[in-house]
Amino acid sequence: MRKNKNFGPDPNLNPYKAKQPTPPSSRSFIDFNTQRVCPSCGKAIKITYNFCKFCGVDLSSIEPIGNSDEISKQLAITAATDPDPGVRKEAIDTLGEFGEKKILGVLTYLLLNDPDENVRKEAADELGDLHHPYSMEVLAKALKDESPIVRKEAIEGLKKIKRKTKPEKLDKGKPKERVDHEE
């Protein structure tokens, strides 16, 4: 029995299966004038949000990079969009030297989304150097990265944050040498 193409759809094809749209590129552009990146989950949200709609993190204490000086904003755009991984890595390094909380989101985004392992490694290093507790979750996610150098740097970053946020032990030494704080 021959099929006539003039008589309706092919019965062997699923009529409900629409053509799949092309998947978005792994590196979508972040407009830092209208968006900010959550430092905990790495997702882009509106710049006006004080809480991440994806993970619920309070962002009110972290200034969006879009509201900051033009140099930081341009470095963030370069770090996220430049085609050369070496340039992106240097932009991340320079942003890290500023040592400000507002770059946490950019570093998180690059750690989770950049295709180059050296760029992701640099982002993990800078997140560890900032010692912010929000970075712990994203560094823990980076432990599953395909690259061993990124995983190693994520471990180092977690160690840096843990050392910085860990309360010092008051009672060190042998029992006789301890200071009695109840006097």
Question: Which residues are covered by each model-predicted region?
Answer:
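Structural detector for internal amphipathic alpha-helices that build alpha-solenoid repeat scaffolds
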Residues: 40-43, 53-67, 77, 86-100, ...
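Residues at alpha-helix boundaries and short interhelical turns
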Residues: 46-49, 82, 114
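Long, contiguous interaction/recruitment modules in multidomain scaffold/adaptor proteins
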Residues: 13-69
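Amphipathic alpha-helical scaffolding segments comprising HEAT/armadillo-like alpha-solenoid repeats
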Residues: 33-35, 64-79, 100-113, 132-144, ...
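Short inter-helical turns and helix N-cap capping residues of alpha-solenoid HEAT/ARM repeat scaffolds
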Residues: 83-84, 115-116, 146-147
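Extended, low-complexity, charged intrinsically disordered regions
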Residues: 2-15
